Amino acid sequence: NGWNDNKTFILIGSASWAALVLLVGSLNSFVI
C-alpha cells in the first residue's frame, strides 16, 4: 500500500512539474 501511495505521489508530482514548466515556457514566449 505504501508503494502505491508513493507511485501516485510521484506521478502527480511529475505531472504538476511538467505543467509548471509548460506554463513558464508559454509565459516566456508571450513576454519575448
UniProtKB/Swiss-Prot annotation:
<keyword id="KW-1133">Transmembrane helix</keyword>
<keyword id="KW-0602">Photosynthesis</keyword>
<keyword id="KW-0150">Chloroplast</keyword>
<protein>
    <recommendedName>
        <fullName>Photosystem II reaction center protein Z</fullName>
    </recommendedName>
</protein>
<comment type="similarity">
    <text>Belongs to the PsbZ family.</text>
</comment>
<dbReference type="GO" id="GO:0009535">
    <property type="term" value="C:chloroplast thylakoid membrane"/>
</dbReference>
<keyword id="KW-0793">Thylakoid</keyword>
<dbReference type="GO" id="GO:0009539">
    <property type="term" value="C:photosystem II reaction center"/>
</dbReference>
<dbReference type="GO" id="GO:0015979">
    <property type="term" value="P:photosynthesis"/>
</dbReference>
<dbReference type="InterPro" id="IPR002644">
    <property type="entry name" value="PSII_PsbZ"/>
</dbReference>
<keyword id="KW-0472">Membrane</keyword>
<comment type="function">
    <text>May control the interaction of photosystem II (PSII) cores with the light-harvesting antenna, regulates electron flow through the 2 photosystem reaction centers. PSII is a light-driven water plastoquinone oxidoreductase, using light energy to abstract electrons from H(2)O, generating a proton gradient subsequently used for ATP formation.</text>
</comment>
<keyword id="KW-0812">Transmembrane</keyword>
<dbReference type="InterPro" id="IPR036512">
    <property type="entry name" value="PSII_PsbZ_sf"/>
</dbReference>
<dbReference type="Pfam" id="PF01737">
    <property type="entry name" value="Ycf9"/>
</dbReference>
<comment type="subunit">
    <text>PSII is composed of 1 copy each of membrane proteins PsbA, PsbB, PsbC, PsbD, PsbE, PsbF, PsbH, PsbI, PsbJ, PsbK, PsbL, PsbM, PsbT, PsbY, PsbZ, Psb30/Ycf12, at least 3 peripheral proteins of the oxygen-evolving complex and a large number of cofactors. It forms dimeric complexes.</text>
</comment>
<feature type="transmembrane region" description="Helical">
    <location>
        <begin position="9"/>
        <end position="31"/>
    </location>
</feature>
<keyword id="KW-0604">Photosystem II</keyword>
<dbReference type="GO" id="GO:0042549">
    <property type="term" value="P:photosystem II stabilization"/>
</dbReference>
<keyword id="KW-0934">Plastid</keyword>
<keyword id="KW-0674">Reaction center</keyword>
